[in-house]
Amino acid sequence: MRIGTILCFLSIFLNTTLNAQKKLEVRLLSSGTNTSLRGMSIPSEQVIWVSGSNGTIGKSVDGGTSWKWIIVPGFEKKDFRDIEAFDSSTAIAMAVDNPAYMVKTIDGGVTWKKVFERAMEGMFLDAMDFRNEKEGICIGDPVDVNGMNRRLFYIIRTFDGGETWKEAPMYHMPAAQIGEAIFSASGTNISFLTNPDFEYAFVTGGTASNLYMVGRQGKKSKVVATPLLQGKETTGTFSMATDKQKTIYCIGGDYKVPGGYFDNYSYTTDAGNKWVSPSISPPFGYRSCIRIIKDKTLVACGPTGVDFAANGQKEWRKASLESFNVCMVSKGKQVFLAGEKGKIGRLSYQ
């Protein structure tokens, strides 16, 4: 009886595990472009915007079934590494390098207007985040803003929905360490916070991988080292995600070693005082993007595949071997991904 009972429970466990694994699947969608994609925004269940190289921006209004592609006039040689959209009509795209630009459309991409331009040695924008439809922030690589040989992380802000952008006060532009920079891998290394002490945070890489938390008015800012791989130009934290419980998730690695899974993921629940890193099953390689699907359920992607964690952030499962640069989650918990050669996919996890 005892052996039979054990075998019965073992059979149930194996069947349950296999069935659970079958629920993870990435379905590729036909996009109609061959452009590298790194930016994505999902303002509703049906509306998806993506952005990429050669001035390319794409939009779907039917949940990814069909796509309309736009080459923004005058920006044919620019990389749009990030995009933020509010609906099917309004979107803001970020063109990264010197000179850096922001462009905005309010008619679904038919026309675009330049809302920001900045030329400066070393200028390179990396990521945006919006708190709501009015207030947004953008961060770039460290530059010598005032000609005093101090490399400060370049930060600009908008309070009118991206119509105008202004440089943040210099005391809100932290100084970078030698060899420290920000990666423009997926537009996800800066985020507004719900923390009462800190307004927003961003993550860095290179010779140092740090988490910077900028204090709210009257509060002190804070910088802490992350436990992620660092020390070379190609290493560090490439993406971050935050939840309402003040947890900050960091992911990255070494983009020159796409299959390397050592020191590529960690999270903190107390503003960096203590970090938790999985010792048994970390993400399966360098990852360029991490997003929260729902409470303690995460998705991450990179050149060697898509990973999924549903058990308190500590154990990751392989969802797909398909390569993607960026993943985003809709309000209805749909997960879409985009990557090289126009690849777009949707993750099924239920």
Report residues per predicted region:
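Bacterial Sec-dependent N-terminal signal peptides
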Residues: M1-E25
